[in-house]
Amino acid sequence: MRRVLVRYKVTADRAAENEAFICAVFRELAQAAPTDVRYCSLKLEDGVSFVHIMEAEGGGGSLTELPAFKAFTAKIRDRCEEPPTATEFSPVGAYRVFTV
């Protein structure tokens, strides 16, 4: 099982665009309905910082191969004030995590 947390900060004028890319990824995930990946995206209180959490069996290809995900990540650095940093993690505990 692979678990990754990604954090970055976009410029204020690109925050809505970034959020639109993220929404497109979730629309494609809903259509494809892969069972080997869990994925969550969060916008932090400042409105420009984002966190993504992924848990996947294998490498996460069900997510990373989606056309919307490729479009989202293709030029993400152009939107960023602070570039993405990825960190693998191990969960310590969780309870009913989120409802969207």
PLM regions and their residue ranges:
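Residue-level signal for secondary-structure boundary sites
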Residues: 14-16, 60, 94
